Design a protein with these regions (language model features):
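Local sequence-structure signature of Cys/Sec-based thiol-disulfide redox active-site neighborhoods
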Residues: 1-28
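Short alpha-helical
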Residues: 13, 44, 74
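Secondary-structure boundary motif
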Residues: 27-31, 92
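A hydrophobic alpha-helix adjacent to the NAD(P)-binding/active-site core of NAD(P)-dependent oxidoreductases
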Residues: 49
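Structural micro-motif
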Residues: 52-62
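Non-catalytic, surface beta->alpha helical segment in thiol-disulfide oxidoreductase systems
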Residues: 62-93
């Protein structure tokens, strides 16, 4: 299993949407609780964020591979689908 590096912002509505998706998916699939997230606020740690190639938050990487990056006007169900893909990939790795 691999760690997920999760870039977020405290006031980002799309990040809150991703957080809800993580909570819901773990409640539905307890095996996802084993996935370790390294949550990095890009405002607080720009020196880390600058090492990764992304434009939007939330954004999730496994290693240096970008698995999910949100986009403007992303709907909750689309976010959830991408977050589940991240969780599955982390468990398989």
């Amino acid at each position: 299993m691999k760690k997920v590096t999760y870039f977020h912002l405290a006031t980002c509505p799309y990040c809150k949407q991703a957080d809800r998706a993580i909570e819901e998916l773990i409640a539905e699939h307890p095996e996802y609780a084993a996935v370790e997230f390294e949550r990095i606020n890009e405002y607080e740690h720009p020196e880390i964020a600058d090492q990764y190639d992304y434009q939007c938050n939330p954004c999730m990487f496994i290693g240096k591979e970008k698995i999910y990056e949100s986009h403007l006007f992303e709907k909750a169900d689309e976010c959830r689908m991408h977050v589940e893909k991240v969780l599955k990939r982390a468990l398989e790795a």
